[in-house]
Amino acid sequence: MKILIASSHGYKVRETKVFLKKLGEFDIFSLVDYPSYHPPKETGETPEENAIQKGLFAAQTFRCWTIADDSMLIIPALGGLPGKLSASFAGEQANDKDHRKKLLENMRLLENTIDRSAYFECCVALISPFGKIFKAHASCEGTIAFEERGSSGFGYDPLFVKHDYKQTYAELPEAIKNQVSHRAKALVKLQPYVETVLANHLLAGKESL
């Protein structure tokens, strides 16, 4: 069964491939394979809206089942920021390091507060080219570190200290992060839908023989 990972981010693609390969025989490809592809601008207010927007566009473009995700980092002390601006906090053309730098600058304005709590919200969607949508949500709670720690991961990983581990996402071994992150938890919740779609695909194939 052919399935598209609607992302060109190497880390996300790798994490999702590991998940899919555990579930069955898939012909997996991603937007990394299509550098000329232009995804739609993310205009959603929530991870669910963005995941569906990205996934539906890609599913209809490539005419195959597609997995798409979106995450937002929410910091109550900053009024919910970066929130829907998580991917563009320091500007549309800024990189991950720029976003982390701006976040730390904003946190320094709150030195008198002890509340550095934060959480990720994530939605992962499985979408057919005909608009059938399955979705799963997950979140992870933690705190924002005072400085970047760790060298792995991406995005806000060097700043997000996950509860129970006392380490940032970027300090955790990739194999561990791929089990405990918000995206990993959402993928696990999506698993029954993926298995059902695969089973139906295999059944349809047998009936056509």
Curated annotation (Swiss-Prot):
Superkingdom per UniProt: Bacteria
GO molecular function, one term: XTP diphosphatase activity
Active site, renumbered: 70 (proton acceptor)
Cofactor(s) it depends on: Mg(2+)
InterPro entries: dITP/XTP_pyrophosphatase, ITPase-like_fam, RdgB/HAM1
Described purpose of this protein according to its UniProt entry: Pyrophosphatase that catalyzes the hydrolysis of nucleoside triphosphates to their monophosphate derivatives, with a high preference for the non-canonical purine nucleotides XTP (xanthosine triphosphate), dITP (deoxyinosine triphosphate) and ITP. Seems to function as a house-cleaning enzyme that removes non-canonical purine nucleotides from the nucleotide pool, thus preventing their incorporation into DNA/RNA and avoiding chromosomal lesions.
Protein name per Swiss-Prot or TrEMBL: dITP/XTP pyrophosphatase
Organism of provenance: Chlamydia trachomatis serovar D (strain ATCC VR-885 / DSM 19411 / UW-3/Cx)
Lineage: Bacteria, Pseudomonadati, Chlamydiota, Chlamydiia, Chlamydiales
